[in-house]
């Protein structure tokens, strides 16, 4: 806080200060423009907190309360209780970490900031009131709108309409729960368009201690012990963030905490998709092809085919935290819903035929039925899904991709058209390959080729063909000459080096410095130092030459160690890469300085540096930030386009992402939270379930983080179990041990879990102790005073119990939160990175070679025909459900 932070709002020496206006004399008070005021009315109607909603808490994106307002209101409810309140508890503070002190300050010396009022909000540096709305509160996730209320009073008449359009777009673009970095970029944009808002005050932006969660304050004050940011105006906010752009606090969420990827509007109505069974068309045809190779005239062969049909498909394909897969191999990789009743009836018919006696159905009859199953996708194309179709039909939006909302419907319709025209061809190919021409299906309709039609001007007469040929030959010759001269120019700029047998130490030809003696190496390579730290950035910030690729690299010049780096990347073993990255970075730094094709070396070095950070974060915390994964994927696309091969099982970025999604430790931490919130028999049941899960996971290969979670969870549950079983006389040491272990658990895994059972026992002990003291007969004036103190303690404990019960009730009510408040989040993802990925994907798919507008139509080549057994089918689960497709016999 600055030195002026202790200055009070009003002059206590003036006797008429209670009658003063908070915003000055009404004749000089700022008035909001009419257009801006009407825009705010529309925004308020859409994003205000419902009148019947609980305004005393902050709800996170999980629907659970994360903070409580008006701490002093509960401590000082009346004049008498205010005088009796312990002095040591009147300052609400929390330790300020070094990372938090960069942007935040301790404001525990200003208790009025934490008090709710019906008058105003405060700004941080001078602790003065700011103009804001006090008749209502914004909905959860939209508290950042309070930042733009004081700006509305500073807008000039000329910019009023432009600022109104800016306000209309603000909630739709940022959505609910944006990041602090997104708010910073929005403020920069507002300053560029409306420079008059530069000195406008803003309400306090408060940070939750130890958690990447922010809240823009209003008349309810700050949550207890939260830290205000060290800025009180638009200019100071922008300057503060600009000076600390490398801080991890910029990834914090305004209004909530956590940044996991999930479907933002997933609700209980979508839970049935978790247990529904899907199968790709490719896997379906491969499985049926295998069934046709079995001898169906024997009992054993029919049982084998029956088992195969019962195991068709996978479950758990999609859920709230798991996105529906995208397909990249063509229409045969779309997903067919097997849990549909129509598909189930056909499968049950084949199943019943397989269970009939051998005399009723011959092998040829069964083969015909099995081949007919291959036409399920063509007969039921309406239940074939791609990612676009699934998300459009269920109105689901994946967070970080709100920019795709407008294109999901269009892409889904295109996918539907392609599938309806392609499935018949796939079925025809399957029948011809599986039956050797014995069975035939009707001729499928041709696949529609989608292209953009352009209006061509009507020519009066056809040009001469020989004239066009002559122009084409002349253009080709001129292009070849220009290309040859350009290559010669590039080669003339390159410096020649002498290659060594081992990793090279290069010197430029014609240099005045004498080369080092044979067998020795210079103290350092020319140019930059080998231990220089590579910049952390994304590919869009670099300018690479298209000629700098793996094919243009001279491996003899680069040395054997660079070849080892290339082979390590191709193998994709994360542990080998983690050990080899530090040495490889120093070698690549030298190559960037001295060898030809330095652009490619720079790209590989940047990729290895980013990958090393991601591997370290994954091994330590089983986590990797979305920005790091996005940068890795961008770099992998660039490297793959330049000839570097990756493992077919998945790139390192994919392996890290899969490891994060399937983290055993994080799943156990969430399971432990569920157990701790339960009481009585529910707690014992969930504790037993958690221990069974731990016992099952110990048999698998685990990371160090998973082992640490398993050990701490086992110790915590083992400490809580005797607390629920011992006698009340022996409860105190066990309860203290369990509470201490729970605190250690929270510190280790950055959680704030509480145990409902432990809290109930602790409060029961306090009540019993107080009741015992009340039952004693007072023998003196001191005993009478003690009895009065006990009565006050009882009253205080009753209020604490009521507050605790209110928190429990608010957690239960929070489950019914509307999906509108959680629809949009994190809208301002790095747009340039997404554009780079899209461009790279377009070039890799040959997008640059497509027909350009104005060129004559050319025949589009037909796709390669489907080949059975071209690859092994991939299954998410191996769970067998014998009665999945069985229906009861009548």
From Swiss-Prot:
Residues of the active site: 143 (for helper component proteinase activity), 215 (for helper component proteinase activity)
InterPro entries, per database record: HC-pro (IPR001456), HC_PRO_CPD_dom (IPR031159), HC_PRO_CPD_sf (IPR042308), TMV-like_coat (IPR001337), TMV-like_coat_sf (IPR036417)
Compositional bias segments (type: Pro residues): 515-528
Statement: the UniProt record of this protein carries the keyword Chaperone: no
GO molecular function, a single term: cysteine-type endopeptidase activity
Similarity annotation: Belongs to the bymoviruses polyprotein 2 family.
Alphabetical GO biological process terms: proteolysis
EC number: 3.4.22.45
Post-translational modification: The viral RNA2 of bymoviruses is expressed as a single polyprotein which undergoes post-translational proteolytic processing resulting in the production of at least two individual proteins. The HC-pro cleaves its C-terminus autocatalytically (Potential).
Pfam families from the UniProt entry: Peptidase_C6, TMV_coat
Cross-referenced SUPFAM superfamilies: TMV-like viral coat proteins
Enzyme class: hydrolase
Protein name: Genome polyprotein 2
Keyword annotations of the record: Coiled coil, Hydrolase, Protease, Thiol protease
Record site feature (Cleavage), residues: 255-256
